[in-house]
Amino acid sequence: MVKLMEVYEGKAKKMIPIDDDKLIMEFKDDATAFDGTKKARFKGKGWLNAQLSVIFFKLLEEHGIKTHFIGVAGGNRLIVEKLDMYPLEVVVRNVVAGSLKKRLPLPEGYELPEPIVELYYKNDELHDPMINYYHAKVLGISLDEIKKIEEIALKVNEILKDYLAKKGIILVDFKLEFGKDKNGDIVLADEISPDTCRFWDAKTKRSLDKDVFRFDKGDLIEAYKEIYERITGEKPEF
C-alpha cells in the first residue's frame, strides 16, 4: 500500500514530504499581515525569501549552527530535514520596534543595551501569545531545552547582526523556530528572510522587510530586492 504523506500549507510556505526524513519547503508569493486580515501576492517574493534563507542558513552552518537546510530544489523550493518541531516562536530583539513599543516606555529605534529574547506559543487560535519558562514546561518543553534554544538564538543574532552591519543593514529583530532531529539535537528550522526579520537601512532607518507591506511604506518587492542585492551584489534572477 502506498503511504500517503500530508502536505502542510501555511500563510507563506508549503511543506511537501519527500520521504520520512526530508521535506520540500516551498516559499509562496503570498504576503499576509495582522493575523491574515491583510493579504496580497507579490511575484518573486517566494524566490527572494528562499534564496535569502539559503544564504543565511549556509552562513550559520559555517559558524557551527545546525540548521534543517539540506539543499535547493528550485528557485523557491528548498530541501530540508524533517524535525519534531517545538510549538514556539523565538523572537530576538536588538532595537525597540513593533510590539515591544507597547511593552516598554522606550521610543522606536532605541538600541537595547543587550538583546531581548522572547518566547511565543505558536498557535493561530490563541494568536501566538507570549509565554515564559513556566508555560513552556506545561507544554512539555524542559528548562534545559529552553536554555539551549535561547543560547542558539543569541548566537544566531550575533552572527547575523555582525554580517548585516557590514552590508549597511541593521538587524532590528527577528523570529526563529526550532525542532529536534532523530538524534535529539536541537536544530534551527523554518526560514530567515525579510518576512521573519526586521531590517533597517543603517543610515536612513528605512524599512527593508515586511513592514513595508504591513504599514504601506512602499514597494515590498523593491525592499526585498534591495536586501538581496546588498547581500549578494547581484540582481535577482526571477
Swiss-Prot record:
GO biological process: 'de novo' IMP biosynthetic process; cobalamin biosynthetic process
Disulfide linkage: none
InterPro entries assigned: SAICAR_synt/ADE2_N (IPR028923), SAICAR_synt_PurC (IPR033934), SAICAR_synth (IPR001636), SAICAR_synthetase (IPR050089), SAICAR_synthetase_CS (IPR018236)
Coiled coil feature spans: none
Catalysed reaction equations from the record: 5-amino-1-(5-phospho-D-ribosyl)imidazole-4-carboxylate + L-aspartate + ATP = (2S)-2-[5-amino-1-(5-phospho-beta-D-ribosyl)imidazole-4-carboxamido]succinate + ADP + phosphate + 2 H(+)
Domain of life: Archaea
Pathway membership, UniProt: Purine metabolism; IMP biosynthesis via de novo pathway; 5-amino-1-(5-phospho-D-ribosyl)imidazole-4-carboxamide from 5-amino-1-(5-phospho-D-ribosyl)imidazole-4-carboxylate: step 1/2
Enzyme class: ligase
Keyword hit for Metal-binding: no
Enzyme Commission code: 6.3.2.6
GO molecular function per UniProt: ATP binding; phosphoribosylaminoimidazolesuccinocarboxamide synthase activity
Pfam families: SAICAR_synt (PF01259)
Keywords: ATP-binding, Ligase, Nucleotide-binding, Purine biosynthesis
HAMAP family referenced in this protein's UniProt entry, alphabetically: SAICAR_synth
NCBIfam families membership: purC (TIGR00081)
Family recorded in the similarity comment: Belongs to the SAICAR synthetase family.
PANTHER family per the UniProt record, alphabetical: MULTIFUNCTIONAL PROTEIN ADE2, SI:DKEY-6E2.2
Name the UniProt record assigns to this protein: Phosphoribosylaminoimidazole-succinocarboxamide synthase
Gene: purC
